[in-house]
Amino acid sequence: MVKIAVDMMGGDDAPGIVLDAVKKAVEDFKDLEIILFGDESQYNLSHERIEFRHCTEKIEMEDEPVRAIKRKKDSSMVKMAEAVKSGEADGCVSAGNTGALMSAGLFIVGRIKGVARPALVVTLPTTDGKGFVFLDVGANADAKAEHLLQYAQLGNIYAQKIRGIQNPSVSLLNIGTEAAKGNSLTKKAYDLFEKNQSFNFTGNIEAKTLMDGNVDVVVTDGYTGNMVLKNLEGTAKSIGKMLKETIMSSFKNKLAGAVLKKDLDTFAKKMDYSEYGGSVLLGLDGTVVKAHGSSNAKAFYSAIRQAKIAGEENIVQIMKDTVGE
């Protein structure tokens, strides 16, 4: 049995979508228990494998992260993180304030001893539908080559255990594929990656080929990773908007759009990385999953499933054994 702590109050459409996702999760997974933290006046579920705990406070999206974690001791997010810290829950999921959740992860759940800096990882879509693991996407704006090496090791374990890839290919994001390309950070990281035998390093990868599906794990610093992630999100939205405007521009195009609706829906699904669940803060002494703030019930459900798999695969212990002291 896996037990997941869930923040009922975090996210743009909470608690509605959270309750819907939790209900579906316990119905689909008979070996899953949920501890749900939130406002009891908004709780409307009844299930033997859902334990509800009332919280008097909520961390808002505009709250300053560290201050919110320190001052709002009875918030749903803080109580959720404490359940992981105490070992009562195997992992946790929230769609709330990203900075606050990262602070809760660092200051409450705590780092694995030996991990210099945790990394935020997402699975992004590829043209072949496989997707790839991408980190760091914003946990740390600055990084040393040694940090990138740890990210590669953590990402490799994540791809193996969460995505089921036996021998993941790991690449370093750079401005060219040649070993000598890049700045001092990427050059030093390349040397460290090449010398390390714990993962399958396949060299540099350029941003233009990220979505081709040729690599399973891509590593970069949090500053670059966050910009790439937001660029991909923005590009996908812009393409969707342009397609819609083109289709609606004439009667002929509207007819074509109706004929192609199923294909367009398939394309949209391929581009939606919420299908893969949330982002995960790797390197902590517990599983912390961040669902997108605008998650619908389906995306939040995927994040719960992601946390469940991490618990089943004992991913935290494997990371301790690999990169911990």
Curated annotation (Swiss-Prot):
Pathway: Lipid metabolism; phospholipid metabolism. Belongs to the PlsX family. Signal peptide: none annotated. Keywords: Cytoplasm, Lipid biosynthesis, Lipid metabolism, Phospholipid biosynthesis, Phospholipid metabolism, Transferase. The gene is plsX. Catalyzes the reversible formation of acyl-phosphate (acyl-PO(4)) from acyl-[acyl-carrier-protein] (acyl-ACP). This enzyme utilizes acyl-ACP as fatty acyl donor, but not acyl-CoA. GO terms for cellular component: cytoplasm. It catalyses: a fatty acyl-[ACP] + phosphate = an acyl phosphate + holo-[ACP]. This is Phosphate acyltransferase. InterPro entries: FA_synthesis, Phospholipid_synth_PlsX-like. One of its GO terms (molecular function) is phosphate:acyl-[acyl carrier protein] acyltransferase activity. The keyword Cytoplasm applies. Homodimer. Probably interacts with PlsY. Its EC number is 2.3.1.274. Its main location: cytoplasm. It comes from Staphylococcus epidermidis (strain ATCC 35984 / DSM 28319 / BCRC 17069 / CCUG 31568 / BM 3577 / RP62A). The keyword Lipid metabolism applies. It comes from the Bacteria. It is found in: Cytoplasm.
